[in-house]
């Protein structure tokens, strides 16, 4: 009986770690600049992606959407960074950012970012993901003011 208890206890300790190891690390995106004194009429986006598998070429694409009167999100014309090479995976998360500047509007508009992530190994594309901006992500650089993180921006 003691042997069964020890085995059961060992499995409960070891199995969660095995399950967690199989899950891909999370991506995130945030608004880190929203119409500040230093960056008027600007929307800054920052994102992070896992730096695995090692050796993969990492790319991000930043796009902006606006909230329609019926609550849907539609693309903002010409608010697309195109694919940006952000580095080679070395085992640590990689952050990158992109800013967009807009003409002043007579009525406010709510904006958010959508970031697409791509991992490439040679000609293979083993992983692709997408994330909409959300609050609560401290970025390593570029936030105005420092530490700013939001899901949306009203311009």
Which ranges hold each PLM region?
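Low-complexity, Ser/Thr/Pro-rich intrinsically disordered linker/stalk segments at domain junctions
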Residues: 2-7, 11, 16-155
């Amino acid at each position: 009986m003691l042997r069964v208890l020890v085995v059961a206890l060992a499995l409960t300790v070891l199995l969660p770690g095995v399950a967690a190891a199989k899950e891909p690390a999370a991506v995130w995106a945030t608004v880190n600049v929203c119409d500040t004194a230093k960056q008027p009429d600007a929307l800054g986006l920052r994102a992070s992606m896992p730096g695995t598998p090692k050796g993969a070429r990492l790319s991000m694409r930043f796009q902006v959407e606006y909230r329609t009167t019926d609550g849907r999100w539609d693309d903002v014309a010409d608010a697309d960074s195109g694919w940006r090479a952000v580095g080679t995976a070395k085992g640590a998360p990689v952050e990158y950012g992109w800013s967009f500047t807009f003409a002043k509007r007579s009525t406010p508009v709510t904006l958010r970012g959508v970031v697409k992530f791509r991992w490439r190994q040679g000609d293979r594309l083993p992983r692709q993901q997408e994330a909409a901006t959300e609050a609560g992500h401290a970025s390593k650089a570029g936030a105005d003011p420092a530490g700013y993180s939001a899901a949306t921006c009203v311009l």
